[in-house]
From Swiss-Prot:
Organism: Buchnera aphidicola subsp. Myzus persicae (Myzus persicae primary endosymbiont)
Disulfide bonds: none
Keyword tRNA processing on entry: no
Entries under NCBIfam families matching the protein: PRK00364.1-1
Source superkingdom: Bacteria
Protein's recorded name: Co-chaperonin GroES
InterPro entries assigned to the protein according to its UniProt record, in alphabetical order: Chaperonin_GroES, Chaperonin_GroES_sf, Chaprnonin_Cpn10_CS, GroES-like_sf
Length: 96
């Protein structure tokens, strides 16, 4: 199955979180937490402005991003991968 985001939506594959603490202790389960970094796997065409024009997104496929998993974030499981469907405004930064 393939997902094609609409408008200003972005599909992100969450990166694995580091499973060791700074002191070398292996973290498991909820102690490890969830990463707020991921790789953009698909994007919509852009945000529709009030005048009807489409503003292209600032992110592109392959970008590593830091995101805020807020109220509007949707989690989708495709095959064995867990993907997040976010709006571009949920993305806080592009990691360069």
């Amino acid at each position: 199955m393939k997902i094609r985001p609409l408008h200003d939506r972005v599909l992100v594959k969450r990166q694995e979180v580091e499973s060791k603490s700074a002191g070398g202790i292996v973290l498991t389960g909820s102690a490890a937490g969830k990463s707020t970094r991921g790789t953009v796997t698909a994007i919509g065409k852009g945000r529709v402005l009030d005048n009807g024009q489409i503003k292209p997104l600032d992110v592109k496929v392959g970008d590593t991003v830091i995101f805020n998993e807020g109220y509007g974030a949707k989690t989708e499981k495709i095959n064995t991968e867990e993907l997040l469907l976010l709006t571009e405004s949920d993305i806080l930064a592009i990691v360069e």
